[in-house]
Regions:
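Short, small-residue-biased leader/transition segments that mark boundaries at the very start
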Residues: 1-3
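Conserved active-site-proximal phosphate/metal-binding subdomains
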Residues: 7, 13-165
């Protein structure tokens, strides 16, 4: 079986990583955290400031409490909101155990809670209880930069890494 047109995502913040993935056969890469704090990003200033203060170790994987309620693993900065999400999962699992709600309703409650938490952080600037989804490259971010400058820097680093190999 041959997989073509594969894109790599997660933890990419430098051009050297891009070069490495391209050499391994990736068709491209996807960066999220790096662009979340670009000058052109609509993210709330407090959301961006939380990223600038963070280290790579602050981005922790989400926890799935109950196998009946799948949670897509994502990294986010640990805060009160991530603790509340874990508590919400326990609460919903309990209502399932008591047969107070159906499975599809339980899953919807989890999805709506987390989607609402992301909006609270990114749009409203609630960095205490909102979801601060961030990859491990968050530790590299120290200030806002224009998208063009970010891309230029990444491409320059990639090209330099490829010519040195």
């Amino acid at each position: 079986m041959c997989i073509r047109d594969s894109f790599v995502a997660g933890g990419i913040g430098r051009g050297q990583a891009i070069a490495g993935y391209l050499e391994m056969g990736a068709a491209g890469v996807q960066l999220g955290t790096r662009f979340a704090c670009a000058q052109e990003s609509i993210a709330h200033p407090d959301f961006k400031k939380a990223f600038f203060r963070a280290s790579a170790r602050d981005a922790v994987a989400s926890v799935q409490v109950d196998p009946r309620l799948p949670v897509i693993p994502v990294r986010a900065l640990k805060n009160k909101g991530s603790e509340e999400f874990t508590a919400k999962q326990r609460e919903v699992a309990g209502t399932l155990d008591r047969e107070e709600i159906a499975m599809n309703e339980a899953q919807l409650q989890i999805e709506h809670y987390w989607a609402g938490a992301l909006r609270r952080a990114v749009i409203d600037g609630d960095v205490e209880t909102g979801s601060l989804m961030a990859g491990q490259s968050v530790g590299m971010l120290k200030e806002e930069e224009p998208v063009a400058a970010i891309i230029e820097k990444l491409m320059s680093q990639s090209e330099e890494a490829l010519t040195r190999r």
